Amino acid sequence: MKKILKPYLIKKKRFVDKRGFFQELFLQKENKIKIKFTALANSRKNVIRGMHFQFKNKQTKIISVISGKILDVVVNLKKNSKDLGKIYYFTVNEGDSIFIPNHYAHG
């Protein structure tokens, strides 16, 4: 039986010293997904972005917060899913990430 993936919060350890910090954002062996590309975006405080979803070339995503925090809303769009339309709310703090499977929209 194929495992159904759901979105989840990823907490990573941040190593801090007088120079700043170091933190791993992604490890293949921990996440078991293939990375096709990476991107970086910056949003100012109180910005609301639209829901993001790719219909033809679906993308599994890991959204990481470098500084500050975000509220990310994630919606299941998988056809014939018993959870179709289910909404998840994630408060993602500085240094944390969320995993979003390819059949979910987020924003």
Listing of model-derived features with the role each one plays in the protein:
Residues M1-V92:
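Non-catalytic, conserved peripheral segments adjacent to functional cores
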